[in-house]
From Swiss-Prot:
UniProt signal peptide: none
Bilayer topology annotation: Multi-pass membrane protein
Task of the protein: Mediates the transport of CDP-ribitol. Does not exhibit CMP-sialic acid, UDP-galactose and UDP-N-acetylglucosamine transport activity.
InterPro entries in alphabetical order: Nuc_sug_transpt
Reactions that this protein is recorded to catalyse: CDP-L-ribitol(in) + CDP(out) = CDP-L-ribitol(out) + CDP(in)
Cellular component GO terms, alphabetical: Golgi apparatus; Golgi membrane
Major localization class: Golgi
Name of the protein this chain belongs to: Probable UDP-sugar transporter protein SLC35A4
TM annotation in the entry: 23-43, 57-77, 92-112, 120-140, 150-170, 181-201, 212-232, 248-268
Superkingdom as given in the UniProt entry: Eukaryota
Amino acid sequence: MYSVNIEPDGSNHSPSRKRLKQILWGLMLVLSVTIYGSHAPLIYLCKVNGEIPFSSSAVVLLIELSKFVISLVFFLIQDWKSLKASVSWHLAAPYAVPAVLYGANNNLVVYIQHFMDPSSFQVLSNLKIVSTAVLYSLFLRQRLSVRRWLSVFLLLAAGVFYSYGGIQDLEKVSSDTNLYVTLPGLLLMLAYCLISGLSAVYTEMTLKTQKIPLNMQNLYLYSFGIIINLTAHLTSSKNSDFFDGFSVWVWVIILSQALNGLIMSLVMKLSNNITRLFIISFSMLANGFLSFILFQLQLTALFFLAVVLIGLAVYMYYGMK
């Protein structure tokens, strides 16, 4: 059985060393929340005349390359002696699965929005919280108590409320928003949420079952990610320059998302996908506060309701006995 603690295991260390590791772990989670929450504001800062000026496929490819390079540096520093035992196609092959699933979902996101409006997409995409928890429970054989299942559904409710109207631009409020969801759109959304949960849970399962260094596992994972995203870029990009539209803010996005990808690998190796779900939920709140501070967007009652629900979910999952 895998641990469901939010902190990594520190039982073999002295109390002071264990405490230090818990503090560092907590700071890492806060950093991850901040990076997740700042992604949308950073995208906004990149826009020129209201449009995104760069190729999204180029940015995603550079994020994968950055994660690979950082993992390679850490591997050469920390795990070089284990190279011979860690390199084989048998160990590498499982990492092709999440790379393909992530690639499929990236394309599915675009296709789904032909069958529903963006607001409905944002609200319904929160179903991946439940799909991830269900698949985590099934594939990793983690039986969640009724109390913990309730906390998962509280995260779902918080995500729905936040997506529906947690923040609001008072200058662009309109009552004429055309909300619609078609049956094909709903079915595609269910597929998207299942694939999202499956890719995350499969990655966690692979990271935990293989007895090789995490840095080597990351190299395998990001190698396939580079192949998939390079293929996507070459097939979708126009004849524009690869770095066309890049600014300082774009590079901040690339480096921060690369760092967050490495943090997520560590979270899934030492903790689990439930911790990851809490990080993503808290990042919504970080996004709301940053949007309020940077862009003077209005925090609505639904935002504060989401804050309460997430706080209650944390207490129910980790605090109640």
